[in-house]
Amino acid sequence: MHPFPDETAHLAEILQKLDAALQEADADVERIDTDYKNAKRYMAQYRGELDPHEMFQNELLLKQTDHTGTIAAASRDRLAKLKDSPYFARIDFKCDDGEEMIVYIGRFTFRCRGEMLIYDWRAPVSGMFYDYETGPAGYDAPAGRIEGYLTRKRQFKIKNCIMEYALESAANIKDDVLQKELS
């Protein structure tokens, strides 16, 4: 039995949401690819009949569709990378104003239905994982300095969607762990 059954259940829930997001991203990429091919086909088929203004509009549409496709493909690729190893850390932080946050930290941000599920390791709040032991902590948010108390720190090794280990840690994390997980 895993030492943190709540973490196993959380991982299963995150993987399910990542699967759904990945399917949606795949469908978006396919739709954009189809739109691009249809616009190209239309331009080739009616090349001699299009006036210069319509030709210009279609070329703009192609460029915009290509750009949108590039962004959609990059988003899909990030989701695919996250699915293999969604996150590598968790911190629980109680703000001085009483708000409690559970923050999972991974290579990329992941939101689902407006809820932040995984924070990018470069986000200000994520820095507490590396910079503080459990106890008084804080970070610089866009709205100003947030102070509070770091109540929990966990590290995870998730590979091929399987949690290989999870451990509780009170110490601040050294860069070798960061480099290993982000490589």
Task: List each language-model region with its residue ranges.
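Extended, charged low-complexity regulatory segments
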Residues: 1-182
